[in-house]
Amino acid sequence: MSTQQALAQANEHALSQANDLIKVGSKLRALSVLRDLLSDRSQWHSSLEQIMSLYVSLCAEQLDYQSLRDGIHHFKVSIMSQKEFSIVPLENIFKEIITPIEQKVDELKEKIEKENQENPLVEQNEISLIDPQQTLLFSYMKYLFEAYKAMIEVLTRQNTKFEHTKFDHSKFDSTLLKISTQALNYCSKYQRKPDFMVLTELFRSSIEQLFKVPSLDTVNTHIEIRFHQLTVAISLGLYLIAYKSIEDINIMLFSLLVKPKPVVLATYYQKLAQVYWITNAHLLHAYALYKHYVYNKNYNMNFTQADSQLYSSVLLVAALSSPIQEVNQNQSLLQFDSQSQRAMGLASLLSLQSIPKRETFLVDVRKVTNEVYPELADLASIFEKKTSPLMFAKLLEPKIKFIEGHAQLSQYLKPFLRVVFTKIALQVSKVYEVIKIEEFIKLVPFYTKTQIELYLLESIKRKLIGARIDHKNGVIRFGHYDFDSAKISDQLSNLATGVGKALNMIEPEKKQQQHDKLKKEVYVKIINSLQDEHRRILARKEIIEKKKIYMEQQDRIKKQKEHEELQKKIQEKVARDQQRLKEDMERREKEQAEEESQQNQLDQTINAIDKAKVEMKAKIAKIAKQLYILERAYREEELPVVESLQKTKAVEDKQYFESTQAEFLKLHREVHDRNVTEKARLNRIVPEYQKFTQAVIEERKKQLPALQKEQEKRFQEFLIQQEQDVQERKAKREKARIAAAQEKARKEEQERERLEQEHLEQERLEEERKNAPYVPPSSRRTFRDDDDEREESGRWGGRRGGDDFGRSKADEGDRWGRREDAPPPRRDEGGDRWGRREDAPPPRRDEGGDRWGKREDAPPPRRDEGGWGRRDDAPPPRRDEGGDRWGRRDDAPPRRDDAPPPRRDDAPPPRRDEGGDRWGRRDDAPPRRDGGGSGGFGGRRDDAPPRRDEGGDRWGRREDAPPPRRDEGGDRWGRRDDAPPRRDGGGGSGFGRNQGAQGDQNDSWRSDNKKEENKKDADGWQTVGAKKRY
């Protein structure tokens, strides 16, 4: 058999075993079986994909993302074991991981949102309660994120725990891009900011690996991932992560790529412009748009005329929206404060050594913005011309309306208006010294008075203009009141320029003569200095060559130093890793010692608390008794004092009552007199009152029939509605009852078919047993001969539901091994007596039953050659009337391995009552039947069928077990082909007998069973010949 065939067979076996475990409800054991298989597989086979699919579904049901991560790593190792492999199976597994969980999350989220919309008040009143559906949703979202994280780790890095050889992960670039995009979209869709931050750190850790092994495709893949990460970060409002993302892109573009693609650079500058806009760096934002426009214009073949018009218009408005810089900017650039450092850091992303000047940048922008919208064609010229401040706002009014109405330009409206305001303020400050506030407000119609004052103060703070707001006189006074030298120098230079122009206009001929004379002198000097200039040029060329050589040497030295530093960093990293591992080991040992110390301390504390409780209880009892005695003494002493106080209080109360009663009678008489007087006064209006009330009552009587009729109509409608509701509820209940009845009938039909199939299978096994050849005892192997074989195959240990027992010599056909220190076997009343240890409790047999001595050190029983203990590869044993039928564990499938199940060491010793075996019940054993049967386990289950009391043993039958049957009126146990003949004596439990053996046919238990041959038992079975039927 080839290796691939062996792998396929082993995989199919594991898959079938896992499916069997799933059918009986043991999904955790099925998951463990598949995990063990994947961890042992280092070679690829196509059947592994099916196994991995089942493994993924089990992990999703259990929400076990740790097992999922390990399984993905093992599956990756199996795929990479091929010389030429395909990543399609890995992509299919990733799809099976993601798709069902995303659907489940969407369903739960929609359900929760729907419930919240239907019951908003319930949601507000139950804020403090934990919603189980919300908790389940968070569990699924946690599992989905951990799955994404595990898949990204598998595709980007090597896990030394599972992978022992280095591998080029660039083959997974396409899959990595797809999975990373889905993970980032998941964070954006469900607003998972913490998960998004974990993903960004995971991506940043891969940059170091890119520097070690740079690959063009891998770098481009990571750049695309960072672009998508930047978009998601901006949508989530995580601007610090967005800045780090653009920094990573800058490093990978200009450090790892020799010549980046123009398309990638255009996208980079577009994303960079978004970052600058968020940070309010409007000038750098416009500069990034300028770069983006240039790359698209020169390299993008799909760049249409409409795109060019839109991009150039956006660039022009963005450039003009950049704030006007200070006149004397050198002082601010020389200050190494945090703001300047921040500005330089942002400018470095554009490969700039300093912040560009606004005027220079506007000149460059005018060269490339010739295709703007017609409405903005003269916008730049309006800003450049010296226009009157009284007309500046009116000229820009249509431009402002166009910008406000355009979708792509409207975001620049606020900074554009700020620049327009600053421009107007600067022009007004040069024309006027004093201007009324109302007049100045008219010059800026798009701002309110409060906004104008605020922006004017900001301009003064930035030293763009010099002004003071005089609210007392309602004016604005312009001028630099600190006598700034810059203002004075501007006035002097303007005066010199004006005087020079006046002189040229007064004496033009004299000026021309002087100019010609100066020109001739210059020509003579140039001719005389030609040789000297030539020598200077040659010397300069030589200096340049030397400087070039020096620069090349410096570059080589710098690269060598960088290489040495990189090697040094690698060595330091290895040393740090080794030190970290050592510290981790020491830390684990220390933590283990601390845990042991804490546990000991905790035990001591608990003992001390228990002791203190006992002492405190005694003290409390003593103090309670003392308080009881003291209280009784107090009450005996205070009794005379209380009686005297009570008498005094009674006299005082009587006096108080008499005085208050006299006062009350006096006041009551006064009130009565006033009421009589008032009644006499009001008697004159009684007729009018009676007349009015009688009119109102007559009017109400006329309206009463109509109101009664309307009320009767509403009542009848209510009754009809109630009747309809009752009929609808009845119909729903009837429909549910019919569905339940149909489901019950379907399940009963399935159960009947299953029982019939098991019955036929049992008959087939019985026919095989009847036709098996006889094996003489001399050709069988003894227990002692198979000692080594049992130890190697792991067949020692307790049988399910049974107890350990000793071995004895063979007696009348059975070859049972016996320990050397055990007494010889004996038989009482036709039964079996097996060897036991001298220190074991004495066995007993009541009414033909067995009592097996239990030894702690005895080997486990097994059923070889007709003895006790069922072989794992044999069919499950049965219990037919009078014999033992060992039930299988309800919560476990049939065992295929040789390993014994765990046995409870604290189980009670076995006993036999009323002619049946009573074995110590295991926690995982089937329920026993009380009374009349051997092998009853534990207390009787409420759902078990009634037992049979008339003779013989009756074992509880599992729901899925085959129906028991009788052969020839007695017990007929199916035996293995290699089983020995049974013992001749009666009693004990009859295990598979040989056809040639002459057993005792007149045993008491067998005779009793024949009497009950044609009677129905409690389960509804009737014995007819050798079969059972309903």
From Swiss-Prot:
Tell me yes or no: is Hydrolase among this UniProt entry's keywords: no
Q: What is its main location?
A: cytoplasm
- GO biological process annotations for this chain's record? formation of cytoplasmic translation initiation complex; translation reinitiation
What subcellular compartments does it reside in? Cytoplasm
Cross-referenced Pfam families = eIF3a_PCI_TPR-like, PCI
Keywords carried by this UniProt record: Coiled coil, Cytoplasm, Initiation factor, Protein biosynthesis, RNA-binding
Under the heading PROSITE patterns, the entry gives: PCI
State if Nucleotidyltransferase is listed as a keyword.
no
Per the record, its GO cellular-component terms are: eukaryotic 43S preinitiation complex; eukaryotic 48S preinitiation complex; eukaryotic translation initiation factor 3 complex; eukaryotic translation initiation factor 3 complex, eIF3e; eukaryotic translation initiation factor 3 complex, eIF3m; multi-eIF complex
The record ties this protein, via Gene3D superfamilies, to: 1.25.40.860, UVR domain
**Region: Disordered, residue numbers:** 576-603, 737-1030
Source taxon at top rank:
Eukaryota
Q: List the coiled-coil residues.
A: 94-126, 527-620, 720-772
Q: Which residues form the PCI domain?
A: 308-483
Its Gene Ontology molecular function terms? mRNA binding; translation initiation factor activity
Q: Where is the composition biased (Basic and acidic residues)?
A: 576-591, 743-771, 800-931, 939-985, 1003-1019
Q: What the protein does?
A: RNA-binding component of the eukaryotic translation initiation factor 3 (eIF-3) complex, which is involved in protein synthesis of a specialized repertoire of mRNAs and, together with other initiation factors, stimulates binding of mRNA and methionyl-tRNAi to the 40S ribosome. The eIF-3 complex specifically targets and initiates translation of a subset of mRNAs involved in cell proliferation.
Family assignment from sequence similarity? Belongs to the eIF-3 subunit A family.
| Subunit and interaction comment | Component of the eukaryotic translation initiation factor 3 (eIF-3) complex.
Q: What is this protein called?
A: Eukaryotic translation initiation factor 3 subunit A
The lineage is:
Eukaryota, Amoebozoa, Evosea, Eumycetozoa, Dictyostelia
* Gene name of the encoded protein: eif3A
